[in-house]
Amino acid sequence: MAQAQRELTKMKSKHTIMEKLWGNEIWFANNEMYCGKLITIEPGEISSKGNFHYHEIKDETFFVVQGILLLDIADETGGYERVTLFENDSYRLMPGFKHRFSAGSEVPCKFVEASTTHREDDSYRCYYDKEKEEWIYV
């Protein structure tokens, strides 16, 4: 039994806190199979400085723990559909969809992201230039 307990202790993982302008992300898992984050967006804040981002590989599901999450999903013309998620709501976002987040209430929005592995080379930031009528990738 003591050996089994020692083996379980080895499986305990550390987390990393990533401070952002809009809140923070607590990464509690990111390995070759999956990623887990607890994300907090402060009231009145929007992710990525208001820009959108997307992933070509990463498949994400969001689960709201506290507050209201406003998930904006962009279309090719620069418009977007806003999905409002309340506590205990979840939403799957498949690869390729441009998106951003904001808090929709006076309290911080906390939500869990469960996804395939997070890779920095699979995060693309962009915004829509209305004059050029095209997406600009930054």
Question: What annotation goes with each model-predicted range?
Answer:
Residues 1-42, 48, 83, 87, ...:
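A short, N-terminal "cap"/entry segment at the start of jelly-roll beta-barrel domains
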Residues 34, 42-46, 66-70, 117:
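Short, charged/polar surface micro-motifs in flexible loops or helix N-caps
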Residues 37-39, 62, 112:
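Conserved hydrophobic/aromatic positions in well-ordered beta-strands
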Residues 49-55, 71-72, 93, 98-105, ...:
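Short beta-strand His + acidic residue motifs that chelate non-heme Fe in jelly-roll/DSBH
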Residues 57-76:
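Glycine- and acidic-residue-biased ligand/ion/polar-headgroup-sensing regions
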Residues 75-96:
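Short acidic-glycine-tyrosine-enriched beta hairpin
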Residues 100-138:
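Double-stranded beta-helix
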